[in-house]
C-alpha cells in the first residue's frame, strides 16, 4: 500500500526539528498574534499530534470511528495552557509528539490505514498539513525579525 503521507509527515517533522534547533528561547517567546507565541504554537502542535496518537492507538484496539471535536473551542481553551508551558519544553514536546504519531502511522496496518481513509479527514494521516501551516507562520515571523530560515 502506498503511503505518500509518510514522506510528507517526515519532511515537516524534520523541518520542525530544524526550526527548534536553531530557535533561541527569545525566538520561542515571539508573538504570533491573537495571544499566541511561537512556543505556544509548538505546544498546540504537540497537543494535536498527541491527540492523533491517542486516536490511532484506540482505533487499533477498538476499530476506527469518527471522533468529532470543536477545534476552535479546543484551541481557544488550549491557549492559556500552552502559554504556561516553558518555551523549550513546548518545543521539545512538539518534536516528541510528531515522532510518536509519525512512527505509529508508518507502522499501521494497511487495513487500519484504509479504515482511516474512509473517514475522509485528511488531517488524520497527513499530520504534515497541520505542521506546515504553523511552521510557515513561525518562519515568516522569524524572517521578518531577521532570524531567517534554513529550510
Task: Kindly label every feature range from the protein language model.
Residues 22, 44, 107:
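Conserved catalytic core of Hanks-type protein kinase domains
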